[in-house]
């Protein structure tokens, strides 16, 4: 992909940029692989806001993406590379030899006509899914399972990749994009290569309207609120927090405080915690 920058014709286009969508080969989604997903606007089943700063945005059709890659030993041809409004990565439409169609995350470098396959004996090529035990050290992988057969849960964002750094016993050690080093069962599947749309991180939205179009609402600072609304609020003018450290609207430590449950069973699989 490439990025197209705007000239400062208006304040909204100054410093703004957009993807050129050069890799997109099909504009309409596959109807059999789409479904309508009602926007929750950050509310739970009682209508209470549980995730702030969400709402509005353009309506979306959800694309059913195959994260399991459980159609083993059946080759598939990449029929199209498509845009997916539900994620920053592109998706690839696969036509399997037996006639089935599926979407997968489009790896970087994959093109229309490429053949991909999943399985224990799949060739070592970009887009193929194999158990971690079969993947050589130093390989970049994405869409990684945490539980065998559950489907990929890690490294699915645009441009993301993890690296296989060690193998010992029943576990394979991975270095994740967050710099966390973690062990995963060797039976878990992962896809060779990194996720496509690598330049997405360099796109600048340029104005508030584009952010609202994505379904994100304003993120108001607590220091400009009233004391009734936030622990940071109140005071005359630009007042300091008035506490030993920043907190959330509900009084919990924020901005750097570790929130992971120390009793979580999977903590023993983390060799080195993430740095940020």
Curated annotation (Swiss-Prot):
Keyword Ubl conjugation: no
One annotated Gene Ontology cellular component of this protein: large ribosomal subunit
Entry keywords, A to Z: Ribonucleoprotein, Ribosomal protein, RNA-binding, rRNA-binding
Biased composition (Basic residues): 259-276
Domain of life: Bacteria
PROSITE patterns according to UniProt: RIBOSOMAL_L2
InterPro entries (alphabetical): NA-bd_OB-fold, Rib_uL2_dom2, Ribosomal_uL2, Ribosomal_uL2_bac/org-type, Ribosomal_uL2_C, Ribosomal_uL2_CS, Ribosomal_uL2_dom3, Ribosomal_uL2_RNA-bd_dom
Protein's GO biological process: translation
GO molecular function: rRNA binding; structural constituent of ribosome; transferase activity
Annotated stretches, region: Disordered: 29-55, 219-276
UniProt-listed Pfam families: Ribosomal_L2, Ribosomal_L2_C
Quaternary state and interactors: Part of the 50S ribosomal subunit. Forms a bridge to the 30S subunit in the 70S ribosome.
Function per UniProt: One of the primary rRNA binding proteins. Required for association of the 30S and 50S subunits to form the 70S ribosome, for tRNA binding and peptide bond formation. It has been suggested to have peptidyltransferase activity; this is somewhat controversial. Makes several contacts with the 16S rRNA in the 70S ribosome.
Family per similarity comment: Belongs to the universal ribosomal protein uL2 family.
HAMAP family: Ribosomal_uL2_B
PANTHER family: LARGE RIBOSOMAL SUBUNIT PROTEIN UL2M, RIBOSOMAL PROTEIN L2
UniProt protein name: Large ribosomal subunit protein uL2
Gene: rplB
């Amino acid at each position: 992909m490439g990025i197209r920058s705007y000239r400062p014709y208006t304040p909204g286009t100054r410093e703004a940029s957009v993807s050129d969508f050069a890799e997109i080969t099909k504009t309409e989604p596959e109807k059999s692989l789409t479904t309508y997903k009602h926007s929750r606007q950050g509310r739970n089943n009682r209508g209470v806001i549980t995730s702030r700063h969400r709402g509005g945005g353009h309506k979306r059709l959800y694309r059913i993406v195959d994260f399991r890659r459980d159609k083993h030993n059946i080759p598939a041809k990449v029929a199209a590379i498509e845009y997916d409004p539900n994620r920053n990565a592109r998706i690839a439409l696969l036509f399997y030899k037996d006639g089935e169609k599926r979407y997968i995350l489009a790896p970087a470098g994959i093109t229309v006509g490429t053949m991909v396959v999943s399985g224990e004996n799949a060739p070592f090529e970009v887009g193929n899914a194999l158990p971690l035990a079969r993947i050589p050290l130093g390989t970049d992988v994405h869409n990684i399972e945490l539980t065998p057969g559950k489907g990929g849960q890690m490294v699915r964002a645009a441009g993301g990749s993890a690296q296989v750094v060690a193998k010992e016993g029943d576990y394979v050690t991975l270095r994740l994009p967050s710099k966390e080093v973690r062990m995963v069962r060797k039976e878990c599947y992962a896809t060779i290569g990194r996720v496509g749309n690598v330049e997405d991180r360099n796109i600048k939205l340029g104005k508030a309207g584009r952010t609202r179009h994505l379904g994100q609402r304003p993120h108001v600072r607590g220091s400009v609120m009233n004391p009734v609304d936030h622990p940071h609020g109140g005071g005359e003018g630009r007042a300091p927090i008035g506490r030993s450290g920043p907190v959330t609207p509900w009084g919990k430590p924020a901005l750097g405080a570790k929130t992971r449950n120390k009793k979580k069973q999977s903590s023993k699989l983390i060799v080195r915690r993430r740095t940020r």
